Amino acid sequence: MKIRKGDTVLVISGPDKGAKGKVIEAYPQRDKVLVEGVNRIKKHVANSAPERGAESGGIVTQEAPIHVSNVMVVDSDGNPTRIGYRFDEDGKKIRVSKRNGKDI
C-alpha cells in the first residue's frame, strides 16, 4: 500500500468527496486508511464502570476507515497525485510524485 501514516490525502469519491485530511492510521492488510475529519460515524458506547476511568456511555462521533482507492496523496504543490518509487544512491526506496517527479 502506497499511502502511509502522516500523509495528507484528498478524498476522490464518496460522500466526503473533496475533503482533505491527514492519515491517522493505515491498515495495509485491509487496504484502508483512517483520515482525520473524514467518514465520521456515530458510535453508541455502553456505560463503563467508574473505576476504569473511561468516559461514560453515550453517542460518540469518530472517524471510520476508508478504502485506499477512494483517496489520493496530495503532493508538495497541493495537487492530488499518484505515487511511484525510485531508488537513491544507497539503494533505499523513495516515494515519488507521478505528477511532478518530486520526492514525497
UniProtKB/Swiss-Prot annotation:
Which keywords does this chain's UniProt record carry?
A: Ribonucleoprotein, Ribosomal protein, RNA-binding, rRNA-binding
The record's GO CC annotations read: ribonucleoprotein complex; ribosome
Q: Which domain of life is it from?
A: Bacteria
Question: Is Ribonucleoprotein there in the keyword field?
Answer: yes
Gene3D superfamilies in the record = 2.30.30.30
**Keyword Cytoplasm appears in the UniProt entry:** no
The record's annotation in InterPro entries points to: KOW, Rib_uL2_dom2, Ribosomal_uL24, Ribosomal_uL24_CS, Ribosomal_uL24_KOW, Translation_prot_SH3-like_sf
Q: Which molecular function terms from Gene Ontology are attached?
A: rRNA binding; structural constituent of ribosome
* Any GO BP annotation: translation
Record family assignment: Belongs to the universal ribosomal protein uL24 family.
Tell me the NCBIfam families matching this sequence: rplX_bact
Protein role: One of two assembly initiator proteins, it binds directly to the 5'-end of the 23S rRNA, where it nucleates assembly of the 50S subunit.
State the oligomer form and interacting partners: Part of the 50S ribosomal subunit.
According to UniProt, the name of this protein is Large ribosomal subunit protein uL24
What is the scientific name of the source organism? Answer: Corynebacterium jeikeium (strain K411)
Q: Give the lineage.
A: Bacteria, Bacillati, Actinomycetota, Actinomycetes, Mycobacteriales
